Regions:
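Pre-NBD coupling/linker segments of ABC/ABC-like ATPases
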Residues: 2-49
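Conserved ABC ATPase "signature" region
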Residues: 28-36, 116, 128-145
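The feature captures the beta-strand-to-loop junction immediately N-terminal to the Walker
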Residues: 64-66
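Conserved H-loop
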Residues: 211-217
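Conserved catalytic segment of ABC-fold P-loop ATPases
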Residues: 217-224
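Conserved ABC ATPase "signature" C-loop
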Residues: 227-228
Length: 228
């Protein structure tokens, strides 16, 4: 099997977090305790343990699991936001991640300003975003709200804007974390139609959902996470 057909390879991924046994309200309090020589005791928490899978170009992987199962953590490892404690992730292509609703946005900026801010996070040039701006605005259906600070947006409006920016060009790998679980049903269907076009063009998708029916409709593979 040649690498040209592989989009993503996840090998023995585990990630450990340290949770404080004591209540520490903020970073300042933590530093003071350390300066005073007070020991902070931690519990180890494994968010993911020994995750393995491989995706071919064009695969659509649905990731299912209850809250706290490690779905979002897995996507953050794949996107490079978190470094795994053990294991490796091999990516073959440009990734467009939509991991947290509004991540990469500045709430005090308008929707228009955030097009350029979030677009730059995704690696798009300002010139490219100016060229694609009307297309982004049209798909988002935000209209005059594009000039309103996004701290005044509903979660559905932020999802519209984020999805419209992230999918303005087809990436090789698209990561979606429950983005299609917010907003109105009409816009979700519109997003699904755009995703279907990407599927037809061979884009690889990792898609977190609580809906088994949605995963069955959109994905050709699925994994179920239970406590990592």
């Amino acid at each position: 099997m040649g690498n040209k057909k592989i989009a993503l390879k996840v090998e023995n991924i585990s990630i450990r977090f340290n949770l404080s046994k004591e209540k520490v309200d903020n970073l300042k309090e933590l530093i003071i305790k350390k300066l005073k020589g007070q020991k902070i005791h931690f519990n180890e928490f494994w968010a993911l343990k020994n995750i393995n899978f491989e995706l071919q170009k064009g695969d659509r992987l649905g990731i299912l699991g209850l809250n706290g199962a490690g779905k979002s953590t897995l996507l953050k490892v794949i996107a490079g936001v978190y470094k795994p404690t053990t294991g490796t992730v091999k990516r073959y292509g440009h990734i467009a991640p939509m991991i947290e609703l509004g991540a990469g946005f500045d709430p005090n900026y308008t929707g228009r300003e955030n097009v350029f801010l979030y677009g730059s996070v995704l690696g798009f040039s300002r010139e490219f975003l100016e060229e694609k701006y009307d297309e982004i605005l049209e798909f988002s259906e935000l209209g005059e709200f594009i000039d309103v600070p996004i701290k005044n947006y509903s979660s559905g409006m932020r999802a519209r804007l984020g999805f419209s920016i992230a999918t303005v060009v087809e990436p090789e790998i698209l990561i979606l974390d429950e983005v299609l679980s917010v907003g109105d049903a009409k816009f979700r269907k519109k997003c699904e139609r755009k995703m279907q076009k990407m599927f037809d063009h061979g884009v690889t998708v990792l898609f977190v959902s609580h809906s088994l029916a949605q995963v069955k409709r959109l994905c050709n593979k699925a994994i179920l996470l239970e406590h990592g």
